[in-house]
Amino acid sequence: MSALAVILVIGLSYLVGSVPTGYLIARHVKGIDIRGHGSGNIGATNVWRTLGPGWGLASLVGDTAKGIVAVLLGRAVGVPGLELLTGAAALTGHGWSVFLRFQGGKIIATSLGVLIMLPPVALATAAAVWIAVLALTRYVSLASIIAASSVPLAFALGGVGWRHVLFGLFLALVAVYKHRANIDRLLKGKESRFSFRK
């Protein structure tokens, strides 16, 4: 497989990740820019809070699908480990979307899609951590930060190879960076807790 094909599939994965699902849903449903409402984030949690649970779930499904598609694109080329690069490209696209002038979301739902397609140890660990932290605190941001941070450790302890550990480190670092405003609010006691009601 040529280097050009590899570059093209990574670029395509970035574009797939860049599709701003929550932004598009909010524009279509209410004619609003979701970035000007709630937390200002384009992700599923803010869509849930702003438009209601149904649209929040739709945003979650769409963003998760982007991660799945990116991994499938990488595997289609047949280069070992390329699915990790295309997965990382999708996360980068979601976090810094070319369609939103390089603004974007916090990568959690798209990370879920990527992890669904990788060895299950990281997904199982991250999901358990996320559910436990959310149940104890009702902070989606804290649950997401800790769950993302568990991914490289899960891959390392799961013995699936250094490439997966490096991908996990990338995912964790980007997730923490994208949640820096949430971290500041958590430290100040000003972060909003999640409610299943709109």
Swiss-Prot record:
Keyword set includes Lipid biosynthesis: yes
Biological processes annotated in GO: phospholipid biosynthetic process
E.C. code: 2.3.1.275
Top enzyme category: transferase
Topology versus the membrane: Multi-pass membrane protein
Keywords: Cell membrane, Lipid biosynthesis, Lipid metabolism, Membrane, Phospholipid biosynthesis, Phospholipid metabolism, Transferase, Transmembrane, Transmembrane helix
InterPro entries recorded: G3P_acylTferase_PlsY
Reactions accelerated catalytically: an acyl phosphate + sn-glycerol 3-phosphate = a 1-acyl-sn-glycero-3-phosphate + phosphate
Keyword Ligase set for record: no
Name of this chain's protein: Glycerol-3-phosphate acyltransferase
Name of the gene this protein is made from: plsY
